[in-house]
Amino acid sequence: MVKLLVAKILCMVGVFFFMLLGSLLPVKIIETDFEKAHRSKKILSLCNTFGGGVFLATCFNALLPAVREKLQKVLSLGHISTDYPLAETILLLGFFMTVFLEQLILTFRKEKPSFIDLETFNAGSDVGSDSEYESPFMGGARGHALYVEPHGHGPSLSVQGLSRASPVRLLSLAFALSAHSVFEGLALGLQEEGEKVVSLFVGVAVHETLVAVALGISMARSAMPLRDAAKLAVTVSAMIPLGIGLGLGIESAQGVPGSVASVLLQGLAGGTFLFITFLEILAKELEEKSDRLLKVLFLVLGYTVLAGMVFLKW
């Protein structure tokens, strides 16, 4: 138990610093060398797709079996027997809850859903993407709007146009990111086995670092002062450690109520991973017209790495 607690505390510290570094580096890099940021687009995209594979394995090879196992223990305490797929239902409830949260943010937003003019972006959308929609959970790095280049057929996105991102939009992005970051942290904090903590940490660290990079790019393009950017970055970076802390508190609770809360929250967190994989990462990355087969390869590679770790009980 002591080793497990130490592992979770190390995860808290690790994810916090990965996210903090990921969100603040773009603020300096884009200000000093936009071309360097442009060249890193492909690397970020492949890392994001690799993260999608990691989350697939996390959801179906680690979280779902854990929820099933804990659910069986909870039901046996109440002498309840059922063949209904309760674990899968709880996981999908988490998925629907995350979809609802995203659509709620879009519905009540007075401003446009993207950090840039959708008309400007969509006028040149045939350059690199088939999409005309930008999720509020995704910054420019994941939607790749920051890197559309002029090809001489219609308006294209200029570097100067990117600086119009308002602080209100940045704050709404930070809120949206924080909302499901807490659930990702909960999933880590609720784990009872060391190998599952490690596999979850890899998935969360890869994904959340890329999320932080997206936030950092948005802050850089909005010309946010470094001090304010640091405050926002610290706030968002603290959400996963907060979730891990909440998970630790719930996991330490004794009796049936603590077990029920643990299995429900773990299942809902699994639904959040499902949302991130299919609607955030894959929906955006695989619609890009470049490197599609390479992205599929990285997706399978990400899944294989985590599935192998679960199989070997590493």
Swiss-Prot record:
<feature type="transmembrane region" description="Helical">
    <location>
        <begin position="43"/>
        <end position="63"/>
    </location>
</feature>
<feature type="transmembrane region" description="Helical">
    <location>
        <begin position="230"/>
        <end position="250"/>
    </location>
</feature>
<dbReference type="GO" id="GO:0060173">
    <property type="term" value="P:limb development"/>
</dbReference>
<dbReference type="GO" id="GO:0005385">
    <property type="term" value="F:zinc ion transmembrane transporter activity"/>
</dbReference>
<keyword id="KW-1133">Transmembrane helix</keyword>
<protein>
    <recommendedName>
        <fullName>Zinc transporter ZIP3</fullName>
    </recommendedName>
</protein>
<keyword id="KW-0862">Zinc</keyword>
<feature type="topological domain" description="Cytoplasmic">
    <location>
        <begin position="25"/>
        <end position="42"/>
    </location>
</feature>
<dbReference type="Pfam" id="PF02535">
    <property type="entry name" value="Zip"/>
</dbReference>
<keyword id="KW-0406">Ion transport</keyword>
<dbReference type="GO" id="GO:0043029">
    <property type="term" value="P:T cell homeostasis"/>
</dbReference>
<keyword id="KW-1003">Cell membrane</keyword>
<feature type="transmembrane region" description="Helical">
    <location>
        <begin position="170"/>
        <end position="190"/>
    </location>
</feature>
<feature type="topological domain" description="Extracellular">
    <location>
        <begin position="251"/>
        <end position="262"/>
    </location>
</feature>
<dbReference type="GO" id="GO:0048701">
    <property type="term" value="P:embryonic cranial skeleton morphogenesis"/>
</dbReference>
<feature type="topological domain" description="Extracellular">
    <location>
        <begin position="1"/>
        <end position="3"/>
    </location>
</feature>
<dbReference type="GO" id="GO:0098686">
    <property type="term" value="C:hippocampal mossy fiber to CA3 synapse"/>
</dbReference>
<feature type="transmembrane region" description="Helical">
    <location>
        <begin position="293"/>
        <end position="313"/>
    </location>
</feature>
<keyword id="KW-0472">Membrane</keyword>
<feature type="transmembrane region" description="Helical">
    <location>
        <begin position="197"/>
        <end position="217"/>
    </location>
</feature>
<feature type="topological domain" description="Extracellular">
    <location>
        <position position="314"/>
    </location>
</feature>
<feature type="topological domain" description="Cytoplasmic">
    <location>
        <begin position="218"/>
        <end position="229"/>
    </location>
</feature>
<dbReference type="GO" id="GO:0005886">
    <property type="term" value="C:plasma membrane"/>
</dbReference>
<feature type="modified residue" description="Phosphoserine">
    <location>
        <position position="129"/>
    </location>
</feature>
<dbReference type="InterPro" id="IPR003689">
    <property type="entry name" value="ZIP"/>
</dbReference>
<keyword id="KW-0864">Zinc transport</keyword>
<feature type="topological domain" description="Extracellular">
    <location>
        <begin position="191"/>
        <end position="196"/>
    </location>
</feature>
<comment type="similarity">
    <text>Belongs to the ZIP transporter (TC 2.A.5) family.</text>
</comment>
<dbReference type="GO" id="GO:0000902">
    <property type="term" value="P:cell morphogenesis"/>
</dbReference>
<feature type="transmembrane region" description="Helical">
    <location>
        <begin position="86"/>
        <end position="106"/>
    </location>
</feature>
<feature type="modified residue" description="Phosphoserine">
    <location>
        <position position="125"/>
    </location>
</feature>
<feature type="transmembrane region" description="Helical">
    <location>
        <begin position="4"/>
        <end position="24"/>
    </location>
</feature>
<keyword id="KW-0812">Transmembrane</keyword>
<feature type="topological domain" description="Cytoplasmic">
    <location>
        <begin position="284"/>
        <end position="292"/>
    </location>
</feature>
<feature type="transmembrane region" description="Helical">
    <location>
        <begin position="263"/>
        <end position="283"/>
    </location>
</feature>
<feature type="topological domain" description="Cytoplasmic">
    <location>
        <begin position="107"/>
        <end position="169"/>
    </location>
</feature>
<feature type="topological domain" description="Extracellular">
    <location>
        <begin position="64"/>
        <end position="85"/>
    </location>
</feature>
<keyword id="KW-0597">Phosphoprotein</keyword>
<keyword id="KW-0813">Transport</keyword>
<dbReference type="GO" id="GO:0001701">
    <property type="term" value="P:in utero embryonic development"/>
</dbReference>
<dbReference type="GO" id="GO:0016324">
    <property type="term" value="C:apical plasma membrane"/>
</dbReference>
<comment type="function">
    <text>Transporter for the divalent cation Zn(2+). Mediates the influx of Zn(2+) into cells from extracellular space. Controls Zn(2+) accumulation into dentate gyrus granule cells in the hippocampus. Mediates Zn(2+) reuptake from the secreted milk within the alveolar lumen.</text>
</comment>
